[in-house]
């Protein structure tokens, strides 16, 4: 089973409507360079031990390119969590000129 994928535009619209929550599975330096506002940050390597922190409802899983988030979204789907992969990851988010939230007010 493969988790469904949504485009950056589709994820942004669903976030705006409150239909899903974003979970960013990137590493610290990637997160610090900018992330989706309101996203929960749990690096991929910590997810298994922190799965209880995931919000209820549909989740959009985010990484840099969509590869790691695809693996995580598939794993979550197999575990009974309603998860989608952000197709193209933050690269697609940037390409669509969608807003990011910098850490400490600046982008690395």
Located regions from the model:
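Short, surface-exposed ligand- or partner-binding patches at beta-edge/loop junctions that are enriched
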Residues: 62
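Rhodanese-like catalytic fold shared by cysteine-dependent sulfurtransferases
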Residues: 1-21, 27-59, 67-108
């Amino acid at each position: 089973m493969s988790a469904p994928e949504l485009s950056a535009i589709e994820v942004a619209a669903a976030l705006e409507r409150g239909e899903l929550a974003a979970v960013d599975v990137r590493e610290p330096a990637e997160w610090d360079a900018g992330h989706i506002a309101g996203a929960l940050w749990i690096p991929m390597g910590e997810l298994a031990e922190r799965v209880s922190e995931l919000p209820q409802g549909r989740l959009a899983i985010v990484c840099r390119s969509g590869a790691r988030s695809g693996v995580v979204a598939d794993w979550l789907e197999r575990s009974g969590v309603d998860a989608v992969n952000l197709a193209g990851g933050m690269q697609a988010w940037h390409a669509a000129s969608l807003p990011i939230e910098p850490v400490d007010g600046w982008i690395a």
